[in-house]
Amino acid sequence: MNKKLKVAIIGPGNIGTDLMIKIMRHGEHLEMGAMVGIDPQSDGLARAQRMGVATTHEGVEGLTRLPVFADIDIVFDATSAGAHVRNDAFLRSLKPNIRMVDLTPAAIGPYCIPVVNGAAHDEALNVNMVTCGGQATIPMVAAVSRVAKVHYGEIIASISSKSAGPGTRANIDEFTETTSKAIEAVGGAAKGKAIIILNPAEPPLIMRDTVYCLSELVDEDEIAASVAQMAADVQKYVPGYRLKQKVQFDIIPASRPINIPGVGQRMSGLKTSVFLEVEGAAHYLPAYAGNLDIMTSAAKTTAERMAARILSAA
């Protein structure tokens, strides 16, 4: 099967440009059709043009006026949560069955973490890629929850300030809300919480993530094995994803329960701590921007699976 589906990317910033380069270099069932922006002076649009990709600086309206629009099957949206709602409604009014891969926290469609629930959404018209922190940490919550009932999952995503563009900064609140909900909906925790830290250190540090899960008491070796397997599965599409150290365990006895702010319960059980780092592939972005690389890699993986399904049905 060497036929490919044409895709458009809305948002020629860091994420959009990195995604474009990944598709052009490594697209299996995908090929670039158009890059869409709103700033005629955009570096990303200029780069796309130099690489032979059709461009428009007139937003999604401009996309629909491009000759290639008739052949576009999948659209990646790397703008902002508010813009995605409008973009989806506008494009769907013209092409009801167009596939949208949402890299914003808008979450119109189901949350998609490829390694956890990607196969369940091959047919979805709109999928949400949660957030960079969600893509890195929710697999670990899911790894614990497939072994034990998780009462509470908390993630802390620390990213280089330099890797956080205007889109990331404009969506901080949406980041925490969307990630928290996805920890529950996809990760399987009864209650989830997400924290993001923009680290201004120079030279920039690569993405680091901490995952805490409070679960029922089970065999610690089972959880450690599940976490290791999940990390290996994520590495298939994000090679720079790795455990920073061994999984840590603490038993919290019922005689000395803890209170978790926001949950408000006296809780006991097994506390699992997972420490991760994510190094980017440096296709376009620097290696320290693992937070952006994991989003573009997850989005491409999801779209490749969608495209394979569409092509096999054709």
From Swiss-Prot:
Instruction: List S-S links within the chain.
Output: none
Q: Read off the CDD domains from this record.
A: ALDH_C
Q: Which GO terms describe its biological process?
A: catabolic process
Annotated Pfam families: AcetDehyd-dimer
For whether the record's keyword set contains Plastid, the answer is: no
What is the top-level taxon of the source organism?
A: Bacteria
Gene Ontology terms for molecular function: acetaldehyde dehydrogenase (acetylating) activity; NAD binding
Query: What is its EC class?
Result: oxidoreductase
Q: Which UniProt keywords apply?
A: Aromatic hydrocarbons catabolism, NAD, Oxidoreductase
Catalyzed chemical reaction(s): acetaldehyde + NAD(+) + CoA = acetyl-CoA + NADH + H(+)
Q: Which residues form the active site?
A: 132 (acyl-thioester intermediate)
List positions binding NAD(+): 163-171, 291
Q: What is its EC number?
A: 1.2.1.10
| Similarity comment | Belongs to the acetaldehyde dehydrogenase family.
- Record-given protein name: Acetaldehyde dehydrogenase 3
Q: Which organism is it from?
A: Dechloromonas aromatica (strain RCB)
